[in-house]
């Protein structure tokens, strides 16, 4: 089987859609080496270079021309006799020849429709047009959670039979053991507290960092935050200054993937009170890192967290505070939930996800 992919996110995105693209190709190429996997893009980058070193993974430059991703990439995939074209980020090429090829698209979320206030009018219109067009063209749609599947049915009016839920995994570095020496070196490099709670993700309104900060106000609980800052950060910063919490909250930037994995392992608790997610990869990363999770009781987050994570109302910082204190002051409960969470998260291991993907690929042909 020859599978072609839209490689834009694989080569261009550092996190999010980039990680999804690289992990998907990596696990397929590793678990099913008999197939051929071809990544199309106008150019390649250093991202994912170790995956491209695999003998069954290759890069193919898209034909030149304006809007080549939209108008040339699909035809290029047909030209090399690909059996399947998989759009990894909610889009498919617009132009195809009559040559047979099956089309699959992954839709991660429809947050721009569910929470339109976070997006400009122009972005909402463009995203909606692209996603609706891809959903109509596709022979099958991968949704990364049951929540996303429900949204696709509701907003894009796609029949349920056309949608398959295939969960995401996470980078293998979060599943690897790390030496005490390395962990201590990271602790020293970033001057981390002896004990702390952790939050990972873009610092934006939807991720709800401000309610974590409000929850620890008045408590001697250090918070470490890792994520890209947006304009929302100013609101958080203003609250920190007003309440003299600057020394209690530590913001880290330019953290490598290996360092991030170490910081997860050093944390006591992972706190993720997001208002909405397509799936919630940081929850999976935390569970693989064997730390207990506190997350929202809405959206897809219970799918990612399992029954032994602790759930909160993201709108209620007093609820967040109570759940943080519950785990912070109870070592045996932290350990129990971390162990149960680690057992649960094995459903998202590479082999299970690769098998689910390949079963759908085979069925569509």
Region annotations inferred by a language model:
Residues 1-365:
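Carbohydrate transferase catalytic cores enriched for Leloir-type hexosyltransferases
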